[in-house]
Amino acid sequence: MKILVCLKQVPHKDARLELTSDGSWIQDANIKFEINDYDNYALEEALRIKDKDAASEVVVLSIGPDRVQQSLRTALGMGADRAIQIWDDGLAHADSLAIAKSIAAVARAEKCDLVLLGLMADDTNFALTGPMLAELLDVPHATGITSAKFEGGQVEVERELEGGALEVVKLPLPCLLTVQTGMNEVRYASLKGIMQAKKKPLDKKSLADVGLSAGAVAAKVKIEKIFSPPKGGGAEILSGSKDEVANKFVGKVKELGLL
């Protein structure tokens, strides 16, 4: 089985974030980055499949400037076989559809049996790339999975729904799955794995290399502004005995016209 795992590099959880001058995104020049948490679980699931079937190949892919190579090397150190980086100036302001189109071009060329992604990205929480990618590849998909069992050319997955409910879905291969956090226990790269990762192939591709133009991945969605929610007026503490506090509370409610 050939498995493509899509990894997004996001700002480190401890990074001190500042907005750009136009307020459209964060300044990313001098902050630390890490693999998106959801994607770590997707990678771990792929590696567990490979643990059971040594003939399986795990290919990791990330879209971004050269800093993403660090995350790709980490994935190789954990056990992935190959890495692919896609970057082009035309992707500098890419939206979810542009990212999905870029991944789809690679997935078609690789002829993958399974595509795995995290449910969403820690920095945007859109959860759009997976379903868009499945549509572009014309393959069945399931989102937010918490378990997967592969047998006889198909996979049975459990999906996490609202309210704690679980849904069981069967899909034929090839297919695409987006993974929920907590699906498994993510491994660390061993020292041996880190050393081996230096010798594993990491292929950097441009849009032209994957058969796309800048126009084909032009963003349809633009983030206009990011801002912190306005601060509230604070809270008023009512003091006194129980009866006094109750009377004051009723008075305040009447004063606000709520009673």
Model segments located where?
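N-terminal glycine-rich FAD/FM-binding segment characteristic of electron-transfer flavoproteins
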Residues: M1-L259
